[in-house]
Structures are given as C-alpha cells and as structure tokens.
UniProtKB/Swiss-Prot annotation:
Presence of keyword Translocase: no
Residues engaged in binding substrate: 81-83, 216-217
Any one GO cellular component localisation term in the record: cytoplasm
Record organism: Xanthomonas campestris pv. campestris (strain B100)
Gene behind this protein: queF
Record flagged with keyword Calcium: no
Pathway, per record: tRNA modification; tRNA-queuosine biosynthesis
HAMAP family named among the record's database cross-references: QueF_type2
UniProt-annotated catalytic positions: 177, 184
UniProt protein name: NADPH-dependent 7-cyano-7-deazaguanine reductase
EC number: 1.7.1.13
GO molecular function annotation: preQ1 synthase activity
Role according to the record: Catalyzes the NADPH-dependent reduction of 7-cyano-7-deazaguanine (preQ0) to 7-aminomethyl-7-deazaguanine (preQ1).
Binding site for NADPH: 83-84, 245-246
Length: 271
C-alpha cells in the first residue's frame, strides 16, 4: 500500500523528459478516513476539484500549446492523487506531441482515472474568481485563541432555537503537509440547515487545525464528520479552497447525500 512517505514529497527529483503516467502517486483514502471514524458507507458525497494552471504540450507539428484545466476526482475513489506527483505528471506532457487538445484531455482523464480507481473528469479552463466569496465571514469575531492543534471537535456546539439555513465562511484555515510540514492555506465555507452553530466555537475549531498535519482532502472530511457528529445538521456542505502550489490548487467539497441544490463553483480571490 502506498504511503505519503513513499511519495516524491520532500525529495529532490529530476523533472521528466517525456510522458510518464507512472509518476502519478495514488494514496489510499481508507487510512485517513479510519482516523476520523469513517468506515463502510460514507456520510457524504463530493469531489476533489483541482485547478491546473501550468499545462502545456506540443501539437502534431511540434509547436507548444498551453492551457488551464479543471479536474474532478470523485470522493468515492479508493485513492487520492498526491499533488507533487500530479505536478510532475503534467510536466511530463511538456515535450510530448498530441494530435489535438482533445487527445490531451482524454489522456489525462484516462491516466488519472486509472490511478484514482474511479472516473476522473477533465475539462479545459477554470471557474471564475469570486472576489466577495460565499457566506458570512466569522473571522472578525473578537475572541482570544491559544489552541492551534490538534483539531478539537469539542469546540463545536449549537444553540437551541429555530432551525436555520445559512452559509458561514472563514479564510483562517491552515493545515500542514504530513510529509514536508509546509503550510497549506485555505478558505473554508460551510453551508447547513439545522440548529444554529456556535460561531465562536466554530472559529476556535478551525484555528485548531493550524498545527495539524494532513492532506487537504482528509482535513475537509474531518471537518465534515466533526460537524455532523457534534452539531447534527439536517444537511451539510463543507468546501475548502486551498491556495496554489506548484501550479495546482485543490478544492475538496463534501456534501450530505440529500443536499437540495447544487453548489456554485468558483475560485477564491487568493487562488
């Protein structure tokens, strides 16, 4: 079984001189899910949406082409794709000739699907940037915080009263690469229907990820599971928009299966 320590993270590697799908490094999701009490049927559906900013190849005549792309990895896939390996894989296309842009798109989709163990969709282009963002920010709350990890679900609580449907947001999420320790920065949005979530407790909880080491996808699943258990919403959506590294950013989203309306798709201003 692949582990993060077996990947190219934190190691000097030679950039590929030609197309090489073996560079893609899948990491099973099961271990990360077991750490937060997830096994068997998942309490959510969703995807890991990747934005690729540095995509290039050669056309049939050897002329370079450039593009951006959006990749959707379903959360039901048995494996996630380690980000440095995806960067190296995409770079392996730089000196490779393709007959058409569609051939590039199809090749990337096939290779990612094979490694992830589920159908991965690929489309050229990126979602628009939303400078305002979705939801009501909780970042201006005037509270003192001195707990930066490990993540503490005990901070999460609800208030008795009328059921609400609201969207809350924070730009203060930070976690760290589990191999290199590099900081990962993100804006997080949660949309839910249920008893009102205590906002001070929610902010303390999100800040308690600050010293936590885990992959982006697993952080979002931990947040979803903790909110589900501690706050018992009727339905819930959690999405994090991580900032770019190596020409890629990752945007995991997890939603309750009964989520009534589709999510809007956009990029954060910091992306």
């Amino acid at each position: 079984m692949n582990t993060p320590e077996d990947s190219s993270l934190g190691r000097e590697v030679a950039y590929p001189s030609g197309y090489d799908p073996s560079l893609l490094f899948p990491i099973p999701r099961a271990a990360g899910r077991a750490a937060v009490g997830l096994s068997g049927a998942l309490p959510f559906v969703g995807r890991d949406r990747w934005h690729a900013y540095e995509l290039s190849w050669l056309d049939a005549h050897g002329k370079p082409c450039v593009a951006t792309a959006t990749l959707h990895v379903p959360c039901e896939s048995p494996a996630l794709i380690e980000s440095k390996s995806l960067k190296l894989y995409l770079n392996s296309l730089n000196a490779t000739r393709f007959n058409s842009a569609e051939a590039v798109r199809a090749r990337i989709a096939t290779d990612l699907s094979t490694r992830a163990g589920a159908d991965v969709s690929v489309e050229f282009g990126l979602p628009p940037i939303d400078a305002v963002g979705e939801g009501e920010s909780i970042d201006a709350l005037d509270i003192a915080i001195d707990d930066y990890g490990p993540p503490k679900a005990d901070y999460l609580a609800t208030h008795a009263g009328t059921v609400v449907e609201e969207v809350l947001a924070s730009a203060l999420l930070k976690s760290n690469c589990p191999v290199t320790g590099q900081p990962d920065w993100a804006s997080v949005t949660l949309r839910y229907r249920g008893a009102p979530i205590d906002r001070e407790g929610l902010l303390r909880y999100l800040v308690s990820f600050r010293d936590h080491a885990d992959f982006h996808e697993q952080c979002v699943e931990r947040i979803f599971q903790d909110l589900l258990v501690r706050c018992a919403p009727q339905w819930l959506v959690v999405e994090a928009r991580y900032t770019r590294r190596g020409g890629l950013d990752i945007n995991p989203v997890r939603t309750s299966p009964q989520m009534p309306t589709p999510l809007s798709i956009f990029r954060d201003l910091r992306q």
